[in-house]
Amino acid sequence: MKMSKKPFVTKEQVEEIVKTYPTPFHLYDEKGIRENAKALKEAFAWNPGYKEYFAVKATPNPFLLQILKEYGCGCDCSSYTELLMSDAVGIDGHDIMFSSNDTPEEDFKLADKLGAIINLDDITHIDFLEKTIGHIPETISCRYNPGGIFKISNDIMDNPGDSKYGMTTEQITEAFKTLKAKGAKEFGIHAFLASNTVTNDYYPMLAKVLFEQAVRLQKETGVHIKFINLSGGIGIPYTPDQEPNDIRVIGEGVRKVYEEVLVPAGMGDVAIYTELGRFMMGPYGCLVTKAIHEKNTYKNYIGVDACAVNLMRPAMYGAYHHITVLGKEDAPCDHKYDVTGSLCENNDKFAIDRMLPEVDMGDYLVIH
């Protein structure tokens, strides 16, 4: 099913909402969020220990965290503030995965106080953590970076070797031995190799890399690996012609690799964790803004009342976000515009040379 270019909100609904909440604002599709969370849970139901730790950084909103909590989701936190937010909505203990890098002392102290599972990014963090909190937790995780280029068939998905995250193969082996000697009893392994992959093959391929590494680590270090965290990376379709991922196919793909690699190694008790963010929220949120100025110089500009502060991706990454002019969903896209915000930065643009229907002042634009 192709993503409709039509958003989940109508012009009439927005006209009602703006009577209470003026633009710009973010809007969420609660029904969509719930259905997706349920589908994810079902896709991994074959694994008794399965848990999704929602990547709070993706949408740090306590109301949304509470919805996901109803479906058994925990929180993947990477900062002090995210830990505070998780605690505020009643998510604590092992329902928090603290995956950070370049971590300040205060963050480790709070993670420990809340009883979070700490996922170490670097081998030097073992001593730093022990010095900071006075002990090594009994349950601990390490982040792995296999290096090199990560490919699916002939497509380069990403370049882990160029990533600042995780430990090398030698380092994670050494880390597990050291942590075991310092009293850790239950271990986890985590890796993130590619971002926003719109393919059903990414998770099963990542799973194979991690499962084989887990078998080797358990054999070489004698530790008990309790969980394997596939982190995030499952993407969403941003353009109308992209096909969305099928989470059922992905879950089944991971199950096959689990039975091929872990079960024969006597590791059929390992829990699978995920840290999806964009996949959980991306399709179910939008930014609603109003056209307030039209400027015609060397190009045609539509100025809106939102700016990069409300949605940074287009300015930061040049990322594509679909724009719908409400009430003109079926009108021909025969006008070329740059859609801009009001920041004194020339990159404050939601779209460049975008074909849209003719935009009138006062029109509501949905960026999704």
Listing of model-derived features with the role each one plays in the protein:
Residues 132, 146-290, 356:
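Active-site loop/helix belt of alpha/beta enzymes
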Residues 1-138, 174-181, 185, 219, ...:
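A charged N-terminal "starter" segment
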Residues 31-32, 55-61, 78-81, 101-103, ...:
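Active-site beta-loop-alpha junctions enriched in small/polar residues
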Residues 19-23, 116, 194, 235, ...:
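A broad detector of the eukaryotic-type serine/threonine protein kinase catalytic domain
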Residues 259-262, 267-368:
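Charged (often Lys/Glu-rich) extended helix/loop segments that serve as interaction or gating elements
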Residues 46-48, 135-136, 222, 244, ...:
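Short, glycine- and charge-enriched coil/turn segments that flank and shape catalytic ligand pockets
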Residues 74, 97, 119, 141-143, ...:
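Structured core elements
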Residues 64, 108, 150-152, 199, ...:
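Short acidic, gly/pro-rich beta-turn/loop elements at beta-sheet edges
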